[in-house]
Regions:
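Non-catalytic, solvent-exposed segments at the cell envelope interface
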Residues: 1-350
Length: 350
């Protein structure tokens, strides 16, 4: 019988015998996009196929390291990585490569998010006061002997633990708001109704926050690495981060991105530049449409400034869309801002 891994430990993932559930299954590809604030590139930095076995009440997280080989049409063989397929060949080809590596025939839905969007989603999952620390912890790889494989496994375990921790709250009003907020922050073809259906079916077939034996993390392609398993409880995040920082400071040196003002300064500079171009709506749209899709303001730690810069960005973008007669795009932004404000008022988001 499959025994869940609990607490901080080390495992040889080749020795684990995973359950083989039967019945209906829905597969959702979760992709973390590596694009800096305002950048339009879309390399897949985190790749996790989450399979919901509805009739068995089980969940399988298949984690694929970004360094996994795939034909990304790079002339440099070092660039032939699955993370780069999303960048060079687009989402459909990337999903095909994920199917090949994971040996899964069908992917039903995709959920993609960049750094800022991930911050917001992690806040929703119970890390409201330390989302940036949690994200830093699960993105770190330089301090681990297994490098990228360990990082990918860490992310898979984070997803597993987050599902367990939050699942029992998804059927109350706050939990439903949380699901809506997470979907609103993502680029996805997964609707709220479809997400609710998955959760309801799992619940009806025995899955809950106290069934750790019903959810597990696999690595594909198969590997015999010894991998560490961490407890990602919010209270333990600071301990893990401190351990990483003490090891990594001699490897990478100073990191300005840890400065809370770093992202705020980028946003201020961008908006100051765009404000001079308000009579050129095409230029405003070109400059701000992508930062809006990234939900770039969420990286700003000071909540008042976060909201202030969000409002300015959205105001400029809505006006530009209206000037070009693109009222549907303008309305989408207004609708999102209203949603985010409702999430914040409910306590779902910071």
């Amino acid at each position: 019988q499959f025994q869940p891994i609990i607490g901080d430990t080390t495992v040889d993932i080749d020795d684990i015998e995973y359950p083989i559930p039967s019945g209906r299954v829905i597969s959702v590809l979760i992709t973390g996009i590596d694009s800096r604030l305002g950048e339009k590139t879309a390399r897949a930095d985190a790749n996790h196929l989450v399979r919901f076995f509805l009739d068995s009440g089980c969940v399988e997280v298949i984690s694929v390291p970004r360094s996994t080989y795939a034909d990304a049409k790079f002339t440099d063989p070092r660039g032939q990585l699955i993370g780069n397929v999303r960048l060079t060949l687009g989402r459909d080809r990337y999903m095909k490569e994920i199917r090949r590596v994971t040996e899964v025939k069908k992917i039903d839905f995709f959920v993609e998010f960049g750094f800022s969007q991930a911050m917001g989603i992690i806040e929703i999952m119970g890390y409201k006061e330390n989302a940036s620390s949690a994200l830093r912890v699960i993105r770190s790889r330089k301090v681990y002997a297994a490098g990228d494989k360990q990082r990918s496994y860490n992310q898979g375990q984070f997803i597993r633990q987050a599902i367990l921790r939050s699942f029992d709250h998804t059927d109350d009003l706050m939990g439903q708001l949380g699901v809506r907020a997470a979907l609103a922050l993502s680029t996805t073809n997964l609707s709220y109704d479809a997400a609710s259906y998955i959760l309801d079916e799992l619940r009806a077939n025995g899955f809950n926050s106290n069934t750790p034996d019903r959810i597990w993390v696999k690595m594909m392609p198969k590997s015999s690495y010894q991998l560490k398993v961490f407890d990602y409880d919010s209270a333990n995040i600071a301990n893990i981060e401190t351990s990483i920082e003490s090891k990594v400071k001699n490897i990478v040196g100073k990191n300005d991105r840890k400065n809370p003002e770093y992202y705020a300064n980028i946003m201020r500079s961008l908006l100051a530049k765009v404000e001079k171009d308000t009579n050129k709506p095409e230029r405003v749209i070109d400059s701000l449409a992508h930062p809006f899709r990234q939900r770039s303001w969420i990286q700003i730690q000071n909540v008042q400034e976060r909201i202030s810069l969000r409002d300015k960005l959205c105001y400029l973008l809505v006006n530009a869309y209206n000037k070009k007669g693109k009222t549907a795009e303008a309305f989408e932004i207004v609708q999102y801002v209203e949603q985010e404000d409702a999430f914040r008022k409910s306590g779902t988001m910071k």
